[in-house]
């Protein structure tokens, strides 16, 4: 059984924790914004600065794609949008028109109509984590790590994860796949299949 010390060391969320976080984010006066913000950040592995700088022009709802401007000299690229992301974006963008400075180029606005800051994003995620009853201290970068671990757990190729997250150095990506216990499943069965005189 994992204790609180283990949870403090863990810097990613499990599938069920992500679901709880999204459910908590989808409440309150800014539910549409906070849910969309959290969902996109997890699905695409956004850094806080990247999601806060997301522009309206980066999103094409008809083509169902989003352009990711990676920071820290990462590789920028275009990602497909899932249907639930398209719906979340449509919901938020329709409500966004009632915010001050709705003509702004930035996708996510504060209640005063300013571009959402990293500090505000941190507060949103931290508050959602608390409302979800999660035992971890939640911060935005955990969503990026959660994306990497989720892809690795699904057996996605390391090189593809590297491109998806915009890593220039694959060593940053290997960290996700190296922690995936699933890659070892059946390893002894495969070994027995290759050797006539197996030990086990």
Curated annotation (Swiss-Prot):
Gene Ontology molecular function: any one: DNA binding
Gene Ontology CC entries for this record: Holliday junction resolvase complex
PROSITE patterns: TYR_RECOMBINASE
Domain called Tyr recombinase: residue spans: 8-189
Keywords for the protein's UniProt record, in alphabetical order: DNA integration, DNA recombination, Fimbrium biogenesis, Transcription, Transcription regulation
One of the GO BP terms on file: DNA recombination
Active-site residues from the entry: 47, 72, 141, 144, 167, 176
Family membership: Belongs to the 'phage' integrase family.
Function statement: FimB is one of the 2 regulatory proteins which control the phase variation of type 1 fimbriae in E.coli. These proteins mediate the periodic inversion of a 300bp DNA segment that harbors the promoter for the fimbrial structural gene, FimA. FimB switches FimA on.
Stored NCBIfam families: PRK09870.1 (NF007370), PRK09871.1 (NF007371)
Stated name of the protein: Type 1 fimbriae regulatory protein FimB
Species of the source: Escherichia coli (strain K12)
Lineage: Bacteria, Pseudomonadati, Pseudomonadota, Gammaproteobacteria, Enterobacterales
Gene expressing this chain: fimB
């Amino acid at each position: 059984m994992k204790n609180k010390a283990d949870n403090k060391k863990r810097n990613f969320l499990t599938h069920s924790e992500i679901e709880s976080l999204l459910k908590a984010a989808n409440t309150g006066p800014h539910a549409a914004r906070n849910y969309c913000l959290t969902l996109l950040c997890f699905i695409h592995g956004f850094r806080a600065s990247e999601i806060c700088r997301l522009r309206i022009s980066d999103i094409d709802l008809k083509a169902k794609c989003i352009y990711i401007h990676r920071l820290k000299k990462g590789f920028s690229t275009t990602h497909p949008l899932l249907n639930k992301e398209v719906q979340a974006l449509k919901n938020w963008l329709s409500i966004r028109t009632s915010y001050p400075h709705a003509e702004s180029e930035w996708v996510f606005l504060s209640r005063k109509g300013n571009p959402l800051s990293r500090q505000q994003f941190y507060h949103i995620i931290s508050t959602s984590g608390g409302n979800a009853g999660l035992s971890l201290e939640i911060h935005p970068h955990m969503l990026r790590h959660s994306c990497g671990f989720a892809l690795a757990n699904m057996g996605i190729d390391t090189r593809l994860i590297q491109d998806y997250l915009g890593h220039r150095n694959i060593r940053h990506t290997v960290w996700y796949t190296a922690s995936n216990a699933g890659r070892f499943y059946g390893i002894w069965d495969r070994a027995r299949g290759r050797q006539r005189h197996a030990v086990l």
